[in-house]
């Protein structure tokens, strides 16, 4: 079928709408959900992933269930959460499913925005990549790795542990996201507060370059403006290497892996279509589409998984519940790194 996606930008969001035709029932899917989704005929997906990545997933969903018309609203982090909260206060919630990373979406878990759904595919996801109650699961995971410029750092210089980055040779040559709270909070949990704070203070003494956004940092690294990024998403490294940038990743223990949480709105206008989306996104078929976007899957039966590049190092799933202490974590991070308020 020839599709002509429409891109709009209401309220600062990118919107992708695709139109489709009629379905073949999915094996194992209950008839009630299928019939309900046919009557609903729509799915509205809020997420921060790039439009091409969302289009790939939604187009595949529509080929499987062509009785659905999907609409994609794109915004990231706090902007996405703010949009959802604003809609709720106004009584005009229009979203069915949301996907986001970081502590911001966990606030929605705490505030009761999500519906329980015991998706059959959840059983393929290990502990730490789903909650026990059935409100959310990890649609993808983003391992956080050290990244270096291969023109500026020789293999013999590579750090063997995080504290090696505090050696004099790296002074003025390091970069880090100025709001990397999820990474810090999880290091703090694993290492203990004293060790984690000592590490941040050491980075500050190294005159580390603090910049908002990992994509921008990856560009600075590729251009040689810094030699090493203390923390970066693995998918950013893979994408930069594909474009010919002289970058490589280094997995130091522990690798914190951020969760790309996916959940259904408890007031979803199209709840059955939302369940179809969750079933598809968590399935082997859906996860194999996810890994083609350079994001990682925690399913063991997915091929071409970027997560498989990380070997012999502990990969710790991010504990989203640490977001309960968001203010304290943010203030510590700013204080010990010297981030401007």
Model-derived segments and their meaning:
Residues 305-341:
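Extracellular/periplasmic bilobal clamshell ligand-binding domains
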Residues 127, 141-142, 170-179, 200-204, 209-211, 281-304, ...:
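Periplasmic-binding protein-like
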Residues 57, 195, 199-202, 269-281, ...:
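Short amphipathic alpha-helical coupling segments at ligand-binding clamshell hinges
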Residues 147-152, 188-190, 258-270, 289-290:
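A bilobed periplasmic-binding-protein/Venus flytrap-type ligand-binding module shared by bacterial periplasmic
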Residues 31, 46-59, 70-88, 92-225:
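Extracytoplasmic ligand-binding site segments that recognize negatively charged/polar headgroups
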Residues 10-21:
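Bacterial N-terminal signal peptides
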